[in-house]
UniProtKB/Swiss-Prot annotation:
Residues with the N-acetylmethionine modification: M1
Identification of the protein by name: Solute carrier family 2, facilitated glucose transporter member 5
UniProt gene name: SLC2A5
Regulation: The uptake of 2-deoxyglucose is inhibited by cytochalasin B. Fructose transport is inhibited by the flavonoids epigallocatechin gallate and apigenin but not quercetin.
MF terms (GO), sorted A to Z: D-glucose transmembrane transporter activity; fructose binding; fructose transmembrane transporter activity
Extracellular side: 40-68, 120-126, 183-192, 299-313, 364-371, 434-439
Segments in the Cytoplasmic topological domain: 1-18, 92-98, 150-161, 214-277, 335-342, 395-412, 461-501
Subcellular localization, as worded in the UniProt entry: Apical cell membrane; Cell membrane; Cell membrane, Sarcolemma
Membrane-spanning parts: 19-39, 69-91, 99-119, 127-149, 162-182, 193-213, 278-298, 314-334, 343-363, 372-394, 413-433, 440-460
Keyword Glycoprotein: yes
Origin species: Homo sapiens
Bilayer topology term: Multi-pass membrane protein
GO BP terms in the entry: carbohydrate metabolic process; cellular response to fructose stimulus; D-glucose import; D-glucose transmembrane transport; dehydroascorbic acid transport; fructose import across plasma membrane; fructose transmembrane transport; intestinal hexose absorption
Positions that bind D-fructose: Y32, Q167, Q288, I296, Y297, Y298, H387, H419, W420
InterPro entries assigned to the protein according to its UniProt record, in alphabetical order: Fru_transpt_5 (IPR002442), GLUT (IPR045263), MFS_dom (IPR020846), MFS_sugar_transport-like (IPR005828), MFS_trans_sf (IPR036259), Sugar/inositol_transpt (IPR003663), Sugar_transporter_CS (IPR005829)
């Protein structure tokens, strides 16, 4: 009875844990979502600014092709920066810690926020392009570090719920940018620099508030070897002094991983004991972006117009779609511990698969069947619901759960790189797919959804309510290795690396 009471106390959501989660997610994940959508509404106004700036310098306006190219570079700088940010994750979290990396990362938000806010006054579109690269780096770091930080703060029974919170704040950021981006608010000639500059507000708040909250106890004990600090952090997070059982669990992981040290990305790819974990995050992160989520949003306005929505009202319908995304991700926070990660992934990708197939038929028939555009709208909303339940929030959560402390930073670097490269690839090639396949474009995404669903069904285990060591034992059997920490033996066979730390 006493042990059960202790488990209940250790597993509760305390005020400190809740506030740490909200500040980390609002200060970092929110910015990611905000910057995804912030340039969509004022796109034409910003291109006009580019052209006027060029005219002021040269006395002539740009041709259509260089203007389109310049805008494409502006948009693509964000995912490119995200890729760079993903590569910085390992070095930052190992040097500064999880909390320290988030605080350092605010540089890549506050500086570009000031630059973008001043770009119109300075008559420099170059400031916007550079700033988009910097906020991309910020998003690349935060999209990996926030799930890692929250996953290491949370007790095992809350790890799923808190692990979905970053994705919830990404969707909230998208919705807020869509609302602020309404033409009668900030998507106008005077307002768009303010719209872009507001991204610095969450960063400034995080910079002020996050230092008062604990660092990851796992980082403190396993990597900094400071058990006293780790115990104090756990006591603050759990709201009571008796945290010996959790400290013992972290110490057990530390003892088992001492021989492993820091596992680099190169070692990660060479280790048989991490084979299925690595392949799983590549498939899930690739499937998340290549399943067509960005293409759906790209196509949504056209679908709404074809259904008879007046052009001046499309912006409100788009914001409504963003609200659906927020609501369904909010639901995922509460059901992830009830239904589990695996079921939400299977359900989410299956809904996306069906939505892509029906949408293909609806787009092909919309000129001959009068009510087909309404089916298209249903498909868009259904896809958004499906993606918000599983494919969007779960993959980053699983990276935290299926890797141990020594390999987790490198795993996030790999997963983040796949995420951003896939994001960039879809943005680059979808217009060509659309031009070549027309209404059948979404068949490509349906196939990816199908393949990802099959992989999840056959390979990905359930991780709900399991400790990191218990999850590692599941993959030990899958990888056909003889012990829970086989990297100790494998690392002996690798050539020595002198500058690995």
């Amino acid at each position: 009875m006493e042990q059960q009471d202790q488990s209940m106390k250790e597993g509760r959501l305390t005020l400190v844990l809740a506030l740490a989660t909200l500040i980390a997610a609002f200060g970092s994940s929110f910015q990611y979502g905000y910057n995804v959508a912030a340039v969509n509404s004022p796109a034409l106004l910003m291109q006009q600014f580019y052209n006027e700036t060029y005219y002021g310098r040269t006395g002539e306006f740009m041709e259509d092709f260089p203007l389109t190219l310049l805008w494409s570079v502006t948009v693509s700088m964000f995912p490119f920066g995200g890729f760079i940010g993903s590569l910085l994750v390992g070095p930052l979290v190992n040097k500064f810690g999880r909390k320290g990396a988030l605080l350092f990362n605010n540089i890549f938000s506050i500086v570009p926020a000031i630059l973008m806010g001043c770009s119109r006054v300075a008559t420099s579109f170059e400031l916007i392009i550079i700033s988009r690269l910097l906020v991309g780096i910020c998003a690349g770091v935060s999209s990996n570090v926030v799930p890692m930080y929250l996953g290491e703060l949370a007790p095992k029974n809350l790890r799923g719920a808190l692990g979905v919170v970053p994705q919830l704040f990404i969707t909230v950021g998208i919705l807020v940018a869509q609302i602020f981006g309404l033409r009668n608010l900030l998507a106008n000639v005077d307002g768009w620099p303010i719209l872009l500059g507001l991204t610095g507000v969450p960063a400034a708040l995080q910079l002020l508030l996050l230092p008062f909250f604990p660092e990851s106890p796992r980082y403190l004990l396993i990597q900094k070897k400071d058990e006293a600090a780790a115990k104090k952090a756990l006591q603050t997070l759990r709201g009571w002094d008796s945290v010996d059982r959790e400290v013992a669990e972290i110490r057990q992981e530390d003892e088992a991983e001492k021989a492993a040290g820091f596992i680099s990305v190169l070692k990660l790819f060479r280790m048989r004991s991490l084979r299925w974990q690595l392949l799983s995050i590549i498939v899930l992160m690739g499937g998340q972006q290549l399943s067509g989520v960005n293409a759906i949003y790209y196509y949504a306005d056209q679908i709404y117009l074809s259904a008879g929505v007046p052009e001046e009202h499309v912006q409100y319908v788009t914001a409504g779609t963003g609200a659906v995304n927020v609501v369904m991700t909010f639901c995922a926070v509460f059901v992830v511990e009830l239904l589990g990660r695996r079921l939400l992934l299977l359900l989410g990708f299956s809904i996306c698969l069906i939505a892509c197939c029906v949408l293909t038929a609806a787009l092909a028939l919309q000129d001959t069947v009068s009510w087909m555009p309404y089916i298209s709208i249903v498909c868009v909303i259904s896809y958004v619901i499906g993606h918000a339940l599983g494919p969007s929030p779960i993959p980053a959560l699983l990276i935290t759960e299926i890797f141990l402390q020594s390999s987790r930073p490198s795993a996030f670097m790999v997963g983040g790189s796949v995420h951003w490269l896939s994001n960039f690839t879809v943005g680059l090639i979808f217009p060509f797919i659309q031009e070549g396949l027309g209404p059948y474009s979404f068949i490509v995404f349906a196939v990816i959804c199908l393949l990802t669903t099959i992989y999840i069904f056959l390979i990905v285990p359930e991780t709900k309510a399991k400790t990191f060591i218990e999850i590692n034992q599941i993959f030990t059997k899958m990888n056909k290795v003889s012990e829970v920490y086989p990297e100790k033996e494998e690392l002996k066979e690798l050539p020595p690396v002198t500058s690995e730390q």
